[in-house]
């Protein structure tokens, strides 16, 4: 009976895969306790079943200890990660510097564009002022010559009142452009202007030719001559002639 139980215990240990010596040896068990060994062997089997779990738990504990043993290596990895972070922070610093350089270049480009826009706007304002308000502008000279033609009696008698003036005809049919030519002679500026006049008399239209010369003392233009040429007729009206 005892031998059968011992064989059962060994088979159980082999099935559980537990290394080491068996719990109870045959020579260590007294013969007088043979009648009471069956419960004790059963208790031993139960104890073996219950102690198998702690061995598994012990295996987990060994694994945790092995992980803790590797903790210095993980600490080194953490250190390397910190170093990489510092390097990345250094990279960010370099990147921020490049961004500052790019922003500075962009601001400089915007400044150049603004300056170019200001210069173009200033040139346009200067041209508009010169064309409209300056005494040496072609439009200003055109206005003065037109007033002289309107007040001339021969022009009024031929064309009738009111006398209107206009410039060259554009592609859209507008009469706004006044043709002129600027040149220098004897160190003085000259300008020749041409425009057209028309009165209340139907079918009569005239072409005004004039020339101005710069006054060396005042710097303003003075009329040299103003002629009105009748297109349908070969006739010329002299409004003003200061060439002599």
From Swiss-Prot:
Region Disordered, residue ranges: 69-89
Source organism: Bos taurus
Function: Participates in the translocation of transit peptide-containing proteins across the mitochondrial inner membrane. Also required for assembly of mitochondrial respiratory chain complex I and complex IV as component of the MITRAC (mitochondrial translation regulation assembly intermediate of cytochrome c oxidase complex) complex. Probably shuttles between the presequence translocase and respiratory-chain assembly intermediates in a process that promotes incorporation of early nuclear-encoded subunits into these complexes.
Superkingdom, natural source: Eukaryota
Major subcellular location class: mitochondrion
UniProt KW keywords: Membrane, Mitochondrion, Protein transport, Transit peptide, Translocation, Transmembrane, Transmembrane helix, Transport
Residues passing through the membrane, by range: 108-128
Family: Belongs to the TIM21 family.
Transit peptide region: 1-18
Subunit relationships: Component of the TIM23 complex. Component of the MITRAC (mitochondrial translation regulation assembly intermediate of cytochrome c oxidase complex) complex, the core components of this complex being COA3/MITRAC12 and COX14. Interacts with COA3 and MT-CO1/COX1.
InterPro entries listed in its UniProt record: Tim21, Tim21_IMS_sf
A cellular component term, taken from the record's GO annotations: TIM23 mitochondrial import inner membrane translocase complex
Descriptive protein name: Mitochondrial import inner membrane translocase subunit Tim21
Subcellular localization, as worded in the UniProt entry: Mitochondrion membrane
């Amino acid at each position: 009976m005892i031998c059968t139980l011992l064989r059962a215990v060994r088979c159980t240990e082999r099935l559980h895969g537990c290394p080491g010596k068996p719990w109870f040896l045959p020579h260590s068990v007294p013969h007088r306790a043979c009648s009471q060994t069956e419960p004790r062997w059963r208790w031993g089997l139960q104890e073996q079943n219950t102690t198998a779990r702690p061995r598994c738990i012990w295996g987990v504990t060994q694994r945790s200890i092995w992980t803790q043993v590797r903790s210095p290596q993980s600490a080194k990895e953490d250190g390397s990660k910190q170093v990489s972070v510092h390097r990345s922070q250094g990279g960010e610093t370099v990147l921020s510097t490049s961004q500052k350089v790019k922003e500075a270049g962009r601001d400089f480009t915007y400044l150049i564009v603004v300056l170019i826009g200001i210069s173009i706007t200033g040139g346009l304002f200067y041209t508009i002022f010169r064309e409209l308000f300056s005494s040496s502008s072609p439009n200003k000279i055109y206005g003065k010559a037109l007033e002289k033609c309107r007040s001339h009696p021969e022009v009024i008698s031929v064309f009738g009142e009111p006398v209107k003036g206009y410039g060259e005809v554009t592609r859209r049919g507008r009469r706004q452009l006044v043709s002129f030519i600027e040149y220098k002679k004897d160190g003085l500026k000259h300008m020749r202007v041409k425009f057209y006049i028309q009165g209340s008399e139907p079918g009569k239209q005239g072409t005004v030719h004039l020339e101005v010369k710069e006054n060396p003392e005042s710097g303003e233009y003075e009329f040299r001559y103003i002629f009105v040429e009748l297109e349908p007729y070969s006739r010329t009206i002299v409004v003003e002639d200061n060439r002599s």
